Every structure is written in structure tokens, then in C-alpha cells.
Amino acid sequence: MDGYNQQQQQQQQQQQQHQMNLGSSGGILHSPQQQQQQQQQQQQQQQQPMNGSNNQLLGISNGGFGTMLQQSASLPINIQGSNSFSTFTPLSADDSNLKKRKIKNEDGTYSEIPYSPNSLVGSNGGLDSSFLMLQQQLQDQQQQIAQFNSSVNSPSFSLNSSQVNNNNNNNNNINNNNNSNNNINNNNSNNNINNNNNNNNNNNNNINNNNINNNNNYNNNNNNNNHNHLQTTTTTTTNNGLTINANNTPSQLSSSSLYPGIIPQISITNTQSGYTPRSISPNPSPNLSPTNSPIQSPHLPTDNYLMIGSENENSDPPSPMTQYNENPPFTWTDYKSEPWYTTFNTNGDEMPVPLLNIMASKGFSYIGGQWIYCRRNHFQLDITAVYPKLFQETQYGHNGVTLSNSSSSVDPTQTPSYMLISGVKTPINGLTLTIKGIKNRADMSQQESEVELFQTNSKREKQGEHAPKPVAIQFGSLVSIQRLHFRKATLNNARRHGQPNPHQEFNQLVVSLYGRCMGQEYCIVSYVSPALIVRTATQVTPPGDLSPVHTPDYAGTSSNNGGGSNNMNCFGPTISNIDFSTMNIVSPGHSPTSPRPLSQLTSQGQTNILRLTQNHNNNNNNNNNNNNNNNNNNNNNNNNNINNNNNSNNNSLGNINNNNSNMLTSSSLLNGRINCFNNNINNNNNNQHNNNNQHNNNNNHHNINNQHNNQNNNNNNNNNNKCHWNSGDTEKSIVYNGKVGINVENPAYALSVQGTIYASEGVYHPSDLRIKYDLKSIDSKSNLDNVNRMKLYDYKYNPQWTHMNGRDPYLDNCDRGVIAQDLQRILPNAVRTIGNKNVNGQEIENLLVIKNEALVMETIGATQELSKQMDEMKLKLITYESKLKNLKKKSKNQTILLIIFMITFLLVALYMYKPSTHHSHHRRHNFDNNDN
């Protein structure tokens, strides 16, 4: 420890000696008395209260840059050419003043503003020279920077190489306390002391980037009031150097104080009606909501849920910038075109009305006091259904007198289980979300008129368009309804005399939450969007004109809260926000991508100052001593994904140039394009990169590797316990090895389904002879006997059981079949148990199920037996028929013989009768003759 103190003292002495040498030779540093005065001024400003708790304005007062530059004869400025910003073009003042642009005022009139830089008037007066003179002076400064760099690189001007190398290549953290005696506590050592800067910070994600290059210390520290604000503190220089105010409180930054007589006062172009130039390149604004979308509902208390409602006492307070013509939120209101039904939890307790947190992140613009939508674009709705955490519960007596008032707290993500329908608690079978488009109605008593709202496929093909289908939702989970658009535009979109058409037609979106009970859908809650004007195409204005602020379209997402940007920290402004042709700095919050301006003019002669917005990014530890914090934050942001963690660490190292360039931009005004003191900013970035690399090589690389291995092991263990779906060998197929349950918590079989199964082509079972043995024939008489012993019943299912199976418990509960207990006595192998089953809170032990295939096989056997019996009956019938035929033939022959016999008998009798008659007549004749 003594050796470390001695080393500190030696470094302090070397630092003071080096300062004295530089001061005596006309160097860069101030005298000790001047440094002491500046440090005392810094301590006084530290004790002053900060103006505003959430929004700190970044700038450098005249005591900083202005004081130094008034003392210096010339400032070496090196402006590198780049395609990322506009270059200066020689224009005469007269020609540039001829070009003017129109600005629309609040009263509908237009005013003209010239494009020339001469039209820019600062708080300190107008321009001292024309734009051409300004360009010539800047070119002269480019020549001076070469001489200045050569003088800096000279041996008399060089610093101790070991000290510079230690600051640029080693992980040596400088903790500049700025004491009154101007003693620099340089805690640099080759032993890589761990994070000495954290002693002065209050558990914030502070950015502490320390460098010493030519005795210019860029020490960027965050405030200690739990807000990530940027402070720029460096030591001051005397001659031919850059002076930065070494104060902990941010001061005002103005171009006139930086370059008096050279660059005019810089102000932000802004109008009273909230318009911005369309030509500015869009950049994500960090002053957005946690969901990176301004078109949303107010927030739920203490959570990031987007609560919807016209009256919300518990919502977050509005932004302090609402007084500057901020766009109103895309507010959804209650829509009670049909009754809302009360819901209950699993315990039967009444629940409050659910909240639909709807976020419309794409497709809508606020123009002229109306929400505009282009029908050729698509929009997306992200919806979450939750219960409010706190709600008021009031009990009333029979005479309407209030008995008690109490507030209850509920779990926002719990799912409703019952719904009150006609005074009866009915189980809820499922929850669905529906979306539709309607025409705006002045009176709710008018009939609702729907408009065509379509949803396209991922390829956005017209053939794939269809009306939005109901989407299943669970409480607490996010559901995204994508690629929605209106088919037709609204009527009377044309304006009359510069005013909205009095006959303008509007469309609205309706989002409803339905619960399915007894085969029908019942509305639980419903919301309607603001009135929308649907246009065929967006209105195109000339480039010089001013267009309204547009809604951002965040196509990309990131694990960081950077508005879809890959940067770890989104500080503004960036290089794309500076228009060098007019020397206007456009605030990122006032760019076309954000409807909320960060700053706005209160008067034409007042100078706007840059404001560093609150950084909500958790990955602010992109410095040389917070690798462990980076690992933790990356694990939290990237869901403990080791790949994303490593990528985030690489991004944090790779994006140091961007982040630190943005931080130092506010102090140098040109976003790192002015390379002062032999490119100290690049050295600062390289220092951070090398410091991080060396620090990781010494300490954190092993920790990160160990953490990487541990996380891989944990992930492997977790993955072993999770379900894995794999793609099959054939096209469009998936494979899962295990038991699958549909509406079944603990499936006992490979596929357990609580409901109805539909198969258009049937179900096939293996029945190959090669997988069977010990075949025995079955007497079909036994099958017939078993079927005859079975009893069929007409019965009704329990309503709770019917509801569990997705059927109407009152209209679709009748069926016909056998009873498992009866079948078990006849066919024991056809009945099994699946264990206990809970039906509406009632436990059923050893629920019996039957195997329908066994009944089918018994029926087949019985049918075969009946077939055999029928065959036997047929044989008997044939025999009896042949016998009957023989009998018929015999009887016929007998009849013929009998007839013949009868005829013969009659003939014989007749013949015998005639002779006897003739003989008696002859005898009588003879007797008569004898008498005579």
C-alpha cells in the first residue's frame, strides 16, 4: 500500500512538473492560480441545485469555451469531409437571400424565411461577415491545425510517453477529484486497480471515460442523482488550446461563445405550429416511451402496461413538453355498443373490468389536428389484456345506501374463469380478440356501419387478404395483429378554403375482448380508436416547405432501449442532426421521427440550447471498468442468452466510438469532426477499447469465459427439461418425442385430448401379421352373446363436463351409448382408468374410459355369427321348398287319377244302368200282350 501511495505521489509530481514546463514554454495549461479558481467555481456549482430532476440541459457557458477562445488568438479546427453531412458551397449573400421557404403559421397564413445563413440571428447579434468569408476563415483554420499538430508532435511539446501509454493502452482509471490545491489524484498503475471511479458515483450506470493526451483530460462522469446525464470535465489550457469548463453542472452551449466573430449564433429551427424541415434525416429519439412508440395509451401505475381509458387518475403525468404543441396520444375510449359481462376468478370473486393495453406503433400520423392513415400502408396493433392492480370496490344496501368502500388489489395477469350470464356464473371456455372497422357516428343511437378492414399475409399479396379473424389471447400475454389496412379511403377528404371539409367522413377501429360460454361469444370489454381520415396516398409537399411531424416507424428492434438502434447509448444530437449548409442544429426529439420536441424557441432572439435527454438504457456501462455490470445488464436485457450477451459486449466495445463521439459532440459542437490535439477523441475511444480489452485480458475475460460456460451448462440443463420440437425428414413436418396433452395437464398417453378430434380421412392403426403372434380363432357365437348382453342408454352429460369438452352444456349434452361399469363386466379389456379427474371442483376417482375398437370388434363377431345363422336358415328353406314342390306334384297327379277314376266310374255306372231299363220295358210289353 505504501508503494502505491508513493507511486501516486510520483505521478502527481510528474504531472505538476509537466504542467509547469508547458506553462513556462507557452504551452496549453493555465497557471495554478487560474486552475484553483476554476476548481473553486466547480465546487460552488456542485452545491447549486440542479434545474429539473428528469431533464438536464447540456451546454458550456461563456466561462468555459467562451473565456478561453476570447483569450486565444486563433483556434485550430480540422473539419473532415464526409458524406454524412452537408459541405459548404460558396454562395453570395445576394443569391442566397433570394431563396426563401414558407412556414405555415397557426392562423393558416404563411410567412417566408430565407435560406441564407445571414437570416440566422443569435442572441448576441447578427453576422459579422458573409457566408463566403466564413468558409474562407474555416479553410484558414484547417491550415492552422496542421501547424498545431506539428507543434504538438515536437519533442518540446510531447508528454511523458510512459504516462500517455499507460492512459491510452492500460486499464488505468483516473479519478480527478478537482481539489482546490489542483492535485490530480492519478490512480493509474500497471496493476489495473479495480474501478476507483465508482467511489464518487451513487450506484448509477455512469460513463467514466478518462484520458490524458497532451494534458487534456476528458473525464465524462454521470450525475449522482439516479439520472444518466452527461458531464464533460477537462483541465483548462492557456494558449493555442481548447478550454472546457471543469464543472459538474452542465452549462449553456452556444456557437457564439465557441467561435466569436466566426460562426453565427446557432439556434434550432422551429415554428410555433410544431413543423420541422422534411429534409432532416430521421433518428430515433431517446425521449420516447418504454415501448418506443408515441402512439399508445397512458401507462399503468408502476408498470409498463399501456392502459386505455378516457379517464385515468393513476396514469403517469404528462410530459413537461406538452405545452410546446405536442401531438396528443392515440387514445382509445370505451365502446359499449353491446353489454359488457362481469367476470369472476377461479374462487368465484367478482373481478373489475379488464383493461386492453393497445399500442398502435405504425401507420398513423397526426396532421392538422386529425389522425391520418394512408390506406396503402399497413398498421399493427399490439394488445395485452390485464386486470387493474387496484380498483375501488363499493357495497350498496337494498335501499341504495352505500355500506362500505374499499380498495382491492388483484393479480393483473390472472385469467377469468366465470362469466355472469342471466344471473348465473357460467364457465368461460376461451378468450378471443376481435378487431373491426366502423364509420364514425355522431350519435351512438345510430346503427353501426362496418367498413372493409383486411389483413394480408407475410408476402402482402392481394390474393391472401382476408378479414381479421378472432385471435386467442391469455391475460398478461402480448398479442400482435399485423399487416392491417383499410381497403377504401374515407369520403370528402378534400379541404375547403384551407379548412377541413365539414362533410368529412371518418373511420374508427374497434377492439373487443370476448369470452366463449355455452357455444356463444359474450363481450367482456371493448374500445374504439380516435376518428381516422383514410387517404389514398400521403400528401407530398415541396422540399423547401415545412411538413408536420410524422409518427416514427420503428421497423427494427433491439435488446436495448434505443428505439430500434444498435447503439448501446442513444445520446443526441448525432452527426446526422447537423445541417452545415445553414448551421442549424435540429434536436433529435424535434426530428420527423418524434412528435415530442426536446426544446423549442420561446422568442426569435433567444438562443436554444442543447438538452441531453434522460437515458433509459440499462447498458450504459460502456467504459473501461464496468465489464461485470455489462455482463449482468446484458443477461437481463437479452434473457440470459449467452450469444446475445457476447454480442452485446462486442457491441458495447464497438459502439464506444459512436457513443463517446456523441457525448463529446455536445462539448465540441461538431460531433467529433473537429479533431483537436492530435485526435484526442479517437485516442479516447482507442483508450477505452484498449482498456476494456486489457482489463478483460487481466480479469474479466476469465470471468466472462467462466460465466459463458456456466450459462451454457445452465442452459443445457434447462433445455434438457424443456420440450424440443424437431423438423421431420419430410417437408413441412415436425417431430416430438414424448407425451402431448391438449387441454390436459398431465397426459398419460402419447396424445391426450380433452375435446373433440376431427380427422377428414380417418385414423389408421397397425395390423400387420408380421407384428402379431399366437393367433386364435374366436367363436362368433360368443361375440353375439356379448353384444346381446350389452345395454344401450340414452343419457345427458353433466353441464360442467360438457363445457370442458367445448360443447354447449345445455343444448349439446344428449348422447347414446353404453356405461363403462356395465361394459367392464362383459368386456374387461375394453375398459381402463385414467386416474382422478377434477370436474368443476369435484374430484372423480379412477375415471373409467372405454376402448371403442373393442366394441367394434365385438360387433363384427356378432355380425359374423348372425351371418352364419342366416346361411343355415337359407339351406333349410331351400330343402323345404324342394319338398313342397314334390308334394305339389304328387297331389296334382293324385287329383288327376281321382278325376279319371271318377269319370270311369260314372261311365261304368251309366252303362250298367241302360241295359236294365230296356229289359224291364220289354218284359212289361210282353205282360201287356199277355193280358190282351
UniProtKB/Swiss-Prot annotation:
Q: Keywords, A to Z?
A: Coiled coil, DNA-binding, Membrane, Transcription, Transcription regulation, Transmembrane, Transmembrane helix
What positions does the domain Peptidase S74 occupy? 767-877
Where DNA binds (residue ranges)?
A: 286-546
Q: Where is this region: Disordered?
A: 1-63, 152-256, 269-328, 540-568, 582-601, 613-660, 680-726
Work out whether the entry's keyword set contains RNA-binding.
no
In UniProt terms, what is the effect of altering R376A? Answer: Loss of binding to ecmA promoter
User: Where is the chain membrane-spanning?
Assistant: 895-915
One GO cellular component term? endoplasmic reticulum membrane
Give the principal location in a single coarse category.
Answer: membrane
Query: Where in the cell is the protein located?
Result: Membrane
Q: Which GO terms describe its molecular function?
A: DNA-binding transcription factor activity; sequence-specific DNA binding
Record's keyword annotation contains tRNA processing: no
Listed Low complexity bias regions? 1-19, 33-48, 152-249, 277-294, 615-660, 680-721
Listed under GO biological process in this entry are: positive regulation of DNA-templated transcription; protein autoprocessing; regulation of sorocarp stalk cell differentiation
Q: Which InterPro entries match?
A: MRF-like, NDT80_DNA-bd_dom, NDT80_DNA-bd_dom_sf, p53-like_TF_DNA-bd_sf, S74_ICA
The record gives the effect of mutating R460A as: Loss of binding to ecmA promoter
Give the knockout phenotype. Null cells are delayed in multicellular development and highly defective in pstA-specific gene expression.
- How does the protein associate with the membrane? Single-pass membrane protein
Q: Where is the composition biased (Polar residues)?
A: 49-59, 311-328
Coiled-coil ranges (or none): 127-154, 863-895
Free-text function comment from the UniProt entry: Transcription factor which acts as a key regulator of pstA (prestalk-A) cells differentiation. Essential for ecmA-specific gene expression.
What is the recorded name of this protein?
Myelin gene regulatory factor-like A
Species the sequence originates in: Dictyostelium discoideum (Social amoeba)
